[in-house]
Amino acid sequence: MTFKLFAGALAALILAGCATPNLDNSAGRAVVYQDVSTTSKRVAGVGVESQDVVSMTDRMIRDILATPQIAGRATPPRIIIDSEYFANDSSSRINKNLITDRLRIELNRAAQGRLVFVARHYGDMVSKEREAKRNGETDKGTVRATKAKAGADFRLGGRITSLDANSAASGTLSRYHQISFELIDLEYETIAWSGLFEFKKEAQDDVLYR
C-alpha cells in the first residue's frame, strides 16, 4: 500500500514537471511615438537624450543668428558644421552627428541665405564628380564650372564633457554635462563665436544607450 502511494505521488510530480507553465503570452505594449523635445516617462537616464539635443541646437541657432559678426555680414560667410572637430570627452555614449547634423540643417533653414554652408563632409563625393567631369566621363552639368572647391571662413569646433558622482548608499547616479560650441576663423585662428549648454541629471536606475 505504501509503495503504491509513493509511486502515485512520484508520477504526479513527474507529470507536474512536464506540464506547460502558465506563461503570459499576451501582446506587449504597442509602439507609441514620443515628442523628441520632452523627457520620456518610461525610459530616461542621465546621458544626453533627444530633448537635450533639440534644446542645445535650438539655443545655438538663435545665438548664432543674433551674432552680427557671423550672420550680419554684407557677404554671407561660408561655414562648415560637422563633427570632425567636435569631440566627445564625456562618460556618455552618443553619436556626435546627432548634434552637429541637426545644428547644421536647422541653422541652414533658419538662416535664409545669411550663411553659406560648405559640405566638407561630402568632399570625397564632390571630388569624384569633378574628376568625372574633367576627364570627359560626364558633361559639365548646368550650374557652373570652377577651378577650385569653396573655401570656408568659419568652422565648428567644440566638445562634450561630463562630471559623474555616485552614491553607494542610495544607488543614485548624478551626471553634469557641459557642451561647448565655437566657430573658428579659418584664416586668423581666432574664435568668432562661442556657445555653452549645460545640464545635470540624477537617477537611481540608469539606462543603456546604444
Language model: regions and residue ranges:
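Solvent-exposed, acidic/flexible segments
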Residues: 46-57, 92-100, 136, 170-177
